[in-house]
Amino acid sequence: MRTRTLLLVIAGLLLLSQPACQQPESSSISFTVRLSEEALQGIEALGLDTPVRGRLFVIVSRDNEREPRLQTGVSGVPFWGIDVEDLRAGETVTLSGADAEVFGYPFASIDELPEGEYHVQALLSVYTTFERADGHTVSMHLNAGEGQDQWRAPGNAISDVVPIHISPGSGKVYPLALQSVIQPDHPVPPGGSLQQGNPPDTDKVKYVKIRSALLSEFWGRDMYIGANVLLPEGYETSNQSYPVLYMQGHFPGSGAPLGYSEEGEGRGRNAGLSEFWRSADSPRMIAVSFRDANPYYDTSYSVNSANLGPYGDAITQELVPYLESQFRIIPASWARVAAGGSTGGWEAVAMQVFQPDYWGGAWGWCPDPLDFNYHQIVNVYEDENAYYTESEWHKVERPNARSFDGNIRSTVRQENHLELATGSRTRSGGQWAIWEAVFGPVGKDGYPQAIWDPLTGKIDHATADYWRANFDVNHYLQSNWETMSSKLDGKLHIAAGDMDSYYLDNAVYLLDEFLNKEAQPRIDTEIQYGRRKPHCWTGYSPTGSGEDMTTAEFVRIAADHMARNAPASADKKWYR
């Protein structure tokens, strides 16, 4: 036994003494991605920072009908990402299944990808460095006129799509090269900026963009906000002034407010809107949508927040006054109402609640969570984990999205892991990221303090307390009802489908319970529920037909509301 033991020890020492080059090579799959000189020059030409800080992606797809980068999503194709620093032309970055810094979706590791034939593409999301007024320095993807979609953003570099055969465990290395840069839809004028895009004016739609002094001071560099302005029929031939319907929501790009089209009819609930807007029967109003994409998302949520800065003030103190100076707009609260769906629904309600004297009415359809006891389907105050419900023997994933018949389309974990793969430190440009950025405090590293661990879903209740104190709309109303009730009388109009795709009806029920049962004094509010209606339901037709309300019908409702609340001395030639 002693002889055998001695031989084993000697053998072990001999193995340890072998040169490093004789160690077994990794069996993990790897992609090497090189940044070409042409791509770097293209990034610089659009005014973005170099050497490049950002996030590098490799995306794979089984088909080549569209580029792989255009097939990502919660039910989309696999991709992996890694943060990069100071990347220069000619340099190469490796994404390996053996590297814990590389994280992907729906497979966390590249090595989890099944064997097969694929089409692969690389994309480099280019970040901008901000030295903010709060003392933090952060690197983020600056909006480049596309909202905040890193897969389509001008200035980001992409490779050609390459067909490959992937064999897990083979240790094979696949080379890719970033050779071109995504270009903006509309050219940047001399001395201009990619931010918020640069769409050209049309007959009735005018595009405005201004430098915001408030936001520029906060972010430490020039920041812009804009608006798409839909003018009424006859605007150019009259000297009349008009009330404004501010349509809230996601980044509109070059789209006209209300879905208006110069060419003809819109679709869905916008059908007939364009013809109605031009008709003799339409109320003569101006409609406006904001272009307020930012480093976190395609809209700012129209409020001041610790992570995004003073977007609420930038809108009401800079952008709206500028619009009122450039167009014949009635600068009065009664002539200034807001409406929107989903994100825009939360924005419209929050703007009215947090600034009740500034806005004259709000229509919030299928709004984002107005009470964080139901942050979609997560109670951030009492639940321990956002991704699962648990009992002694069972662990069940929380649903994130459903069909109107109840079938589950995705889970909270899946969408959060999708965002984590898209961007570390809340830089995904996605829905859950912007909620953390708007509702939450600044973390020690300058990025938003997470409401829960992005990998495990464990909730941070101290951060949840901050959410409640600052952005829980129902909590805010209950805490300030005595002073606010009279200012909101007749101004809140909310609609939600009782099968909302993202469970957003749950928070509406809680707000409804307070406004229509508990609140004293009671005020006039309107809350509708649509039976078996999904996201984003906007309410029933005022005709009583049981059909869904059209956009043209809503324009009439908003006009009636403003005319009814206008002072007796107001000029109402616009109303019909």
Named regions from a protein language model:
Residues 1, 31-37, 56, 494, ...:
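Generic low-polarity alpha-helical segments
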Residues 1-7:
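Bacterial N-terminal signal peptides that target proteins for export
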Residues 7-8, 91:
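Residue-level marker of intrinsically disordered, low-complexity segments enriched
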Residues 14-27:
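Bacterial Sec-dependent signal peptides at the C-terminal "C-region" and cleavage site
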Residues 26-56, 226:
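Contiguous beta-strand segments within globular domains
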Residues 60-103, 108-576:
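Non-catalytic cap/lid and distal C-terminal segments of serine-dependent acyl enzymes
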